[in-house]
Each structure stands twice: as C-alpha cells, then as structure tokens.
Amino acid sequence: MPKQKTHSGAKKRFKVTGSGKIMKQQAGMRHNLEVKSSKRKARLNQDQPLAKADMKVAKKLLGR
C-alpha cells in the first residue's frame, strides 16, 4: 500500500508545536486593517490553538 500523502492545504495552514498542539493563524488580518485598532491587530496577529473538535481531522490531514 502506498504512503499517505500530507494534505497540501493543511500543510500551509497549520503548524504543530513541540508539545503536539496544532496552531492556526487567526482570521481578520487580510484587509480593512486601517479601521482596526493597533491593539486589535496585535491580538489578531497571534497564532491560536486549533479547537479540540477540529484536532482529530487536522492530525489525519497532516499525517500524524
């Protein structure tokens, strides 16, 4: 049986930490940035852990 390939879209969107958590980029930093406060932009620019409900699917897509 051939090896399972890593999902290209998931590979670009998620990063796995050393402890095994999956991190994702928050939405809302692509456009209309002039109307958002610096405080809000700083908060949106941080990586966020993936929800537990999505973790199982994401791990499968990443081949983990």
Swiss-Prot record:
Location of region: Disordered: 22-44
Q: Which InterPro entries match?
A: Ribosomal_bL35 (IPR001706), Ribosomal_bL35-like (IPR021137), Ribosomal_bL35_CS (IPR018265), Ribosomal_bL35_sf (IPR037229)
Gene Ontology annotations of biological process type: translation
Does this UniProt record's set of keywords contain Ribonucleoprotein? yes
SUPFAM superfamilies xref list:
L35p-like
- Family, similarity comment: Belongs to the bacterial ribosomal protein bL35 family.
Protein name stated in the entry: Large ribosomal subunit protein bL35
**Organism name:** Clavibacter sepedonicus (Clavibacter michiganensis subsp. sepedonicus)
